[in-house]
A protein has these predicted regions:
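Short, motif-level signal for alpha-helix interfacial/capping segments enriched in acidic residues
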Residues: 52-55, 160-162, 264-265
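Cleft-lining beta-strand/loop regions that shape enzyme active-site pockets
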Residues: 120-208, 213-225
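Short, flexible active-site loop motifs that bind/organize anionic cofactors or intermediates
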Residues: 69, 154, 273
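Intrinsically disordered, low-complexity segments enriched in small/flexible residues
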Residues: 1-136, 144-146, 305, 309-486
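Conserved catalytic cores of soluble enzyme domains
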Residues: 1-11, 16, 182-333
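A generic hydrophobic-helix recognition signal that picks specific residues
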Residues: 68-69, 176, 240
Length: 486
């Protein structure tokens, strides 16, 4: 009986979840589920165990059928409500179910400068030929929690982004990959020094030059707060997530030209959510993300353990692909093709995530080219053709001159200066040896110096003798000294 009550309680939670996601929509399906749930709850009081088991199985099947049916009717705004729901998975769920071990750093819970930013050092365990390998990674992301108010809804303050940047540099020093998870509606609107925009810009500048692999996973990517930790080599996105420069409500306020105190209509918000193209499929088509991770029907929740296994495989695959793409090797192409197969278990493969100096330079160059290409693709250029050609030639010449200046001259300038110092020292030594015979003058040919002059130059003077030689002209007694003597 207690087991059935527990199942009924879980089904009631799923029904409340449907009501929250579809307010005022699909009322017939939701009413059918509510009726069947109440009916079976009454039947359990008088039916036999076999009948109760059959009723619970039929109710489970009905819930599954309705959820799959509603999954096909999801709108962009429905996905926004899924992402914002308290039952949505959070970063702590991912740390507990995707990684084998983790230790939170930079403060825990409320005892940190920003509870909305969680940073942890985690390990992924992989096996090959019976040998176990523990690969360390740095995991960071926005933590919304499940209704925890002190998390501030995942909106990070500037000092939280500063903490993330500090530990990114620590990961670069240790040479371990960085995994970031984006669960934020946007950065917290505060302009205390450093301001939100300034800190995000600093994070972007520093992340563009980090020499370790970076993988970002998007669930809720809102405005610049998402960009503060997501400039990565591989960008993945959950199938029910959204990634937008502004929230649908904010876009509706601008579109409707609302005055203070006014609220946008649900129809306008729905239309703005569709026009913003914020879903995972839209962002994949635009090229802003590299891969979509499929979730269960109506979004992933903490009890969907199969989804966490899928997420683990995708995270490992993205990290391996990033490392192999910049590593030189004869079989690199074959490994990359093998990694793209979905039926392979990456926990039974082992690829070292350590990069050489040359691979790190190629990694940074690839990352910078990727985001420069994305920025050019998002820009509508209406300049005349001749102006485009002239600017393109100027840019090409600037790239060539920069390569000559920095890749050739500046890179070897220190070595050249060291070589010149060594050559100068050797020349001085050679010159001294060549001129040494001419400097050996016989002692009797040196000019003679008067003994009195030698004594004055090589001995200390005596004060009494000096005063007598100067006949007391330098003697001075202050008036105060005369009074003291008297």
């Amino acid at each position: 009986m207690m087991e059935w009550e527990k199942q009924l309680h879980q089904l009631a939670d799923r029904l409340c979840y449907l009501k929250d996601i579809f307010p005022g929509k699909h009322e017939e399906d939701i009413a059918l589920l509510q009726t069947r749930l109440d009916e079976i709850r009454r039947k359990l009081e008088s039916c036999t165990p076999d009948e109760a088991q059959a009723e619970m199985t039929s109710l489970e099947d009905l819930f599954f059928f309705i959820e799959c049916k509603l999954e096909d009717k999801l709108t962009p705004m429905d996905k926004v409500r899924i992402v914002r729901h308290p039952h949505r998975i959070c970063l702590r769920d991912i740390l507990e179910n995707v990684y084998d071990n983790y230790t939170e750093i930079g403060g825990q819970g409320e005892h940190t400068n920003d509870p909305a930013m969680v940073i942890a050092r985690a390990y992924i365990t992989r096996k090959r030929h019976g040998k176990v390998y523990h690969q360390p990674v740095l995991v960071m992301g926005h933590e919304k929690g499940h209704g925890e108010e002190f998390r501030n809804g995942g909106s990070v303050k500037p000092w939280g982004n500063s903490k993330a940047l500090q530990y990114m540099k620590v990961a670069e020093t240790e040479g371990i990959p960085i995994h970031t998870y984006v669960f934020t509606p946007g950065s917290f609107p505060i302009e205390d020094t450093p301001g939100a925009a300034q800190q995000i810009a600093k994070n972007l500048y520093e992340m563009a030059g980090l020499t370790v692999p970076m993988v970002a996973v998007f669930s809720e990517g809102g405005s610049g707060g998402a960009e503060a930790i997501s400039l990565a080599d591989r960008r993945l996105m959950l199938s029910h997530g959204y990634y937008s420069v502004i929230s649908p409500e904010g876009a509706a306020a601008i579109e409707g030209r609302l005055k203070p105190g006014q609220r946008a209509t649900p129809e306008l918000i729905e239309r703005c959510a569709t026009q913003l193209h914020i879903t995972a499929e839209d962002n994949l088509q635009f090229g802003y993300i590299d891969r979509v991770i499929q979730e269960p029907s109506l979004g992933a929740r903490p009890y969907h353990y199969d989804f966490f296994r899928t997420l683990r495989q995708e995270i490992i695959r993205a990290t391996d692909e990033t490392v192999l793409s910049v590593r030189s090797g004869m079989f690199r192409g074959a490994l990359l093709r093998r990694m793209s197969r979905d039926d392979i278990n990456l926990d039974e493969m082992y690829i070292r995530w350590h990069l050489s100096q040359g691979a790190r330079e190629r990694l940074v160059l690839r990352r910078q080219k990727k985001f420069l290409r994305l920025s050019r693709g998002a820009y509508i250029d209406r300049r005349p053709f001749l102006n485009k050609m002239r600017n393109s030639m100027r840019e090409s010449w600037g790239n060539i001159s920069a390569r000559i200046k920095y890749a050739l001259i500046t890179k070897h300038q220190r070595k050249f200066a060291y070589l010149m110092d060594e050559m100068t020292s050797e020349m001085h030594l050679l010159k001294r040896r060549l001129t040494a015979p001419f400097c050996r003058i016989p002692r009797d040919q040196r000019p003679s110096i008067e003994p009195e002059t030698v004594r004055n130059l090589t001995t200390l003077s005596d004060w009494d003798e000096e005063s007598e030689s100067r006949k007391g002209k330098w003697t001075y007694i202050s008036p105060r000294a005369k009074e003291d003597r008297a």
